[in-house]
Structure formats: C-alpha cells, structure tokens
Amino acid sequence: MPDSVDLSYAIGLKPAQAIEYFQSKGYTIGFNWHEVEVRAHATAFTVAGILRQDILQDVRAGLQDSLDNGLTLEQFRRQMTQKLTQKGWLADKAKLVADEDGVLEGKQLTPRRLRTIFETNMQSSYGAGRYAQQMENAADRPYWTRVAVMDLRTRPAHAALNGLTARYDDPIWQFAYPPDGWGCRCRVRARSQSDIDSKSISVWSSEGHLETVQQAWGPQDTREVQAFRYNGQLYTPDAGFGHNPGQGWLAGLGQRLMDRSVTAPPKMAALAVQHTLSEPQLLDAITSDMRRFVNQSLLREPAGAFRHAGALSTRTLDALASRGRMPDSAVLTVTDYAVVQSPGPLWELLPKQLRQPVAVAADGDDLLYVIRNGDALHQVRATPVDNAQGYALQLPDGGKSLTPASLQSLAELPLLEGSFDGL
C-alpha cells in the first residue's frame, strides 16, 4: 500500500519533482507525464486575445515562469503589471472604460484581463494533462462526467451541466470538453462501469440532441457552431472554444488564436501566428488536426466547417502594401467545401508549407502560393473572403504537380515573396 503523502509539500513542487515525490511514496503514474508536461508547456504560451508580438512574448515568459516556479496568480499579475506598464500597454484602470473582459479598444490590458488570461491558459495547460491521462485509461474508465465547481462564480449554463455523464467517444467531447469558455473552471471525472452501476448514474447520449446554431462573432458577424440540448436547455461553448479540444488541446488553442487573428490588424495577426506556429508541438498538433478535419470532411456533406491553416507572412503583407493592396485580414482558411472539391494529401501539409513557401505571387486580388512536397511543386490559391474574413484556400487542378509551363506562367505574375529561380 502506498505511503501517505504531504499534499501541502507536494503542491509547491515543480512538475518533475512532484511526480518523483509521488512515485517515491509508492504511487504509479499511469500515463506518459513527460509528454504531457511538454504539451502543457507548449499550451501555456498560446495566449488567445493578445496579438501584439512584444506582449505575446512577455505573457509567454510570465506563464512559463509560473509553470516552472509555481507562481501564484498575484505573483504573475504583479510581474506582468510592472512589465506592461513600463511598455505603456497597461494604463490606470480608473481612467479607462473597459468591456466586461477588461479589453480597452483592443489595445490595452487591465489587471482583470490579465487574470482572465492567466486562469484560462493555466486551466487549459492542466486540461491537456487530464485529457491525455483519461484517453489512455478509456478502456477501464470509458464514462466521463462533467463536474462544475458549483459556487457563486459558476455560470448557470455551466452549473446546469454538472453531473452530465457520457461515453468518452460521444461527439460532445469534441467541442465541450472543459475549459470551454473564458473563466471556465469545470473539469471531467472518468468513471468505470462498476462506478456507473454502483452509483446508478444515468449515461446520456448526444444522439438526437446536437444542433448547429449561429453564434455572435465580433460586433457585426456570426458563425455556425455546434451546440447540444441537455435537460431542455441549449448549450454552446464560448466563441472560439468549439474547435474539437477533446482531440487536441494544442490544436484547439492554435485555432482559437487564429480565430482572434481574423479580426486583428493584418500585421499584428501575422506576427502572432508566425510566432505561435514556430512552437513545434503546436505546429504538429495543428497538422494532425488538419488531417482529421480533411478525413471527416470527406465522409459527410459539406456544411461550412473550416480550419485555419496559418496567416500571410509579414513579407507578403509588406509587398501587398507597397502595391496598395493591403488586405483587411491575414488569416488563411481551409473549408470543407474546398476539401471535397479537391481531395488529397496536400491539405494536411499546408500549416507547415505555407509558413515557408517556395514563392508567393499576386493574381489580381488572389494570392498564388507555390509549395513543395518532396520533389514536386504544387499551387495553392488564396482568395479573399467577404466581410474581412481573410483568405479561403483552394487546390487548383485537384492539387496536381505543376508543369514547367505552369511554373513559367506563374513566374510572369508579380512576385510577393520567395523566388522562381532554378525551378
């Protein structure tokens, strides 16, 4: 039988030391915690809602320090307040008018906003570990129960889901695995069949209860998102939190940041996406998620689902600006309609290849990317979307390899980035 542990001592340890401490007491860690820790660290600095490069770096450093050294919220906030005030990004709260999240005209931050960022991202970091552990143990504990804190801070919609129990492979966990909203403190408890039987717990299924709804997205836009009815009430995750987090926390956070980038100034969005996708763990997660999205899109009728694949580079934006064609949004998006029109393996390569294209040319308002797949070159067309929603990606000619004649035609277009020399 394992020895007793001193939780007051263990809670202040760094992750590696905490694991070693519990193992020394005879406890077996039933999941690959090294992998989970790496994912948690990668998750921690993918900060949604802060798209300015210098601030993103500061917040990343602060969150990393919090994970490494077990800093409290107050220590994190004090550290970030001093740093952001010095840079002129944090103003006197008494002199400003902020929205409910503390955001000031999209440019400045308040301590309340810092609290939201800290709690949401740390909760997501720990959620990555919980999810990995529960998936590895799904054969023994295949039933998941959603648990809310149930205090005065718990939102009624989240409190209403307290106790919801469904199988781990139920579709709702693809978009409603917590945290699924700003400030969400809910978690999931895994249960065995004997636990279900002994406690007479009812297992719910989302079959017949899933709906597609229009959700407000920014001040003047809406988008189709998934929702479900439970006990007669319709539940929808917060805007930006419905990107299949149950199958990839990092991919979900990456999609969330790019969602926010859609309405950000293009240069700011390009810097944020470029910086964030430089994290190998995140880029791999987004690539895997794109593969799943493509496979799922080919199994059903197109319904307007999409995945972001990246953003225009700052070099391309500068070239467009010099031509008087600065876009309203820099985000590049793959839709299920485009996948069905041109099925193939190229789609999953886009998150990586679009970051370092062979060349980018202008064709009117469209952009033509040339990317490499082994020894072959392929063309990707990016077409501006209405209402400043970035660019929709397509694979001309079904993604076939470019011929010498096709390359010659592309080389005659205005070059924005890269080179056609030697191709």
What spans do the regions from the language model cover?
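Domain-core detector
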Residues: M1-G181, R191-A303, W347, V358-L367, ...
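Extended alpha-helical oligomerization segments
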Residues: R185-R189
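Ribonuclease/tRNase effector modules and their secretory precursors
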Residues: A264-L423
